[in-house]
């Protein structure tokens, strides 16, 4: 009987680990303090990069926060206003956007009218200058204007349908990055490796031709993308990490070139990412947080850079030790998001939009777990 209950406990722990994959997120404030939300039911401020190697992150959990029980929770920094916008953090109210005022360490809840926007199926970025979310949902580009919000309005905001992209979206599991007020769509079906389709935000215009980022560039495969901030001004570089974690690619939209850095130590297709000016942070499906340093002035330093654990977060919120399919596999999981891009999709996708069966596998896995528990208790 003891062995049976031990197995049941492990199975339940596996389920909780799977839930963690989409329920936590990380972000930076404008002083480049790393904030981790929803780790073990709490929120933490890990401080700036020079403090990550030791000590304990500060507990900043307070009232008004979201429950962090969504399946694809993602965080976005509004640099002009030092606010963190959190999407998909409340399974009971999935359209709500929670606002964390980093200056006052306070939360508020912004209601949102969705219209034709599908909150269960979208990918989004937050534009630096306009403070507008742009999202691709079921083949349509939508926008939501956050204005100058550091706390919620009493009136709801609205998702607005802009137009359909000029490129094909059939079977496309979007990968989106923001740089120079342009949205870069990676891994579009039919596109070559190292290329992207571009939407010019300020002119509301899809460029008719694709953009290339060098001959030794990123692969044509699904992955996660996030932009490197600057102390002031728009982002000019973004990182792309393919789902297999084989490398980290940093793309400069100023020179249309790509650097190749080490891939994360944990190969996790369900991981999410967020970048400051000089660090790229990974949050894995099990809640482990690590980073790699980045120097936009030194290719040599970037080539030599390696990934390290953020120790002061690990000391207060250790990652779960249960291995899951998303924590060790190299495929594409549909139960995931992307920090700085939110991926909420009903199907998974491989290279150039080949649809997979992630949801079916997850559902089957959960059914087997529940069935196993029932048999063990007999």
Describe each model-derived feature in a short phrase.
Residues 2, 11-27, 373-378:
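N-terminal signal peptide
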Residues 20-28, 64-81, 114-128, 165-175, ...:
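Repeated scaffold domains used in trafficking and secretory/extracellular systems
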